[in-house]
Amino acid sequence: MLKNDRLLRALNRQPVDRTPVWLMRQAGRYLPEYRATRARAGSFLGMAKNPDIACEVTLQPLQRFPLDAAILFSDILTIPDAMGLELYFVEGEGPKFRHPVRDAAAIHRLGVPDMETELRYVMDAVRVIRRELDGSVPLIGFSGSPWTLACYMIEGGGSKEYARIKAMAFNAPELLHHLLNTVTDAVIAYLAAQRAAGAQALQVFDTWGGVLSPAMYREFSLPYLTRIARELERGDGAERTPLVLFGKGNGAYVADLAASGAEAVGVDWTISLADAAQRAGGRVALQGNLDPATLYGSPEAIRAEVGKTLDSYAQGNGGSREGHVFNLGHGMSPDMNPEHVGVLVEAVQTLSKR
């Protein structure tokens, strides 16, 4: 039995006593205890692939701040790693793949990994975290979106231009759709396995959907997000596991995402929550959307911006604050001040009381 079910109630647009809050990358390098754990583990993957350490890191922000959810400590690139692309990290450059997929032969060789063998460490982490949380707050599981994973798989790492995947979209769209369908199958299986292991809410991160033109987004990202929302088994009624579709730069597509079948849409700070709520039309909950850079501001500035964000949602939602989960519009950065996170969380709790 959950002692704090605010997140799940808000995602299902049910009444809550105040707006729930959690933060993308709430377990991360801005916390000195995270940096100490990483030094002990030796690497990011050394933490992510050890269920006990992944649990320790997942719980660190909850030991500091009264957050309303834990999110699994992992990486969006676990699926392609398990497909054989071999993930590694370069200091200062981020994730890379030793075996990117750039031709038909490589793409057709890909299959859906077995979730309890190749990705057992993720499921074990979910089980350990659920046990340690002991019903205090819900645990969020997650995956990267098919488009975002395909970007990394084809580019071989992060990119500014996305030249290789966009070239494939123009020159060999059928091949790219084949890859996206395979990855979508894997994402659905991955999220279902996390749910079976104990995840109580699920989020898909479409980090790079915003690099696409509207026409390309509607061809290469939206249909696959919709497939996930419609095909992922999440249960029924009060026991249904809510799904959040988050995208960077997805403001223009809120209405499309609201029609996908997901329970909630996460937006970044490039659209006002008032506008997003009007576009959503009461069909989904909304999550977001404070600019993470606000945390570089003074405590007074942070409180003011939190208030504006809460008010913006209510303004677009007929004066009601129901159906809103407070979050940042993207993940936190390593140089942010943990004390400012405390200010943010306290401000949400104080200013959103019903």
UniProtKB/Swiss-Prot annotation:
It comes from the Bacteria. Keywords: Cytoplasm, Decarboxylase, Lyase, Porphyrin biosynthesis. The keyword 4Fe-4S does not apply. One of its GO terms (biological process) is protoporphyrinogen IX biosynthetic process from glutamate. One of its GO terms (cellular component) is cytosol. Belongs to the uroporphyrinogen decarboxylase family. This is Uroporphyrinogen decarboxylase.
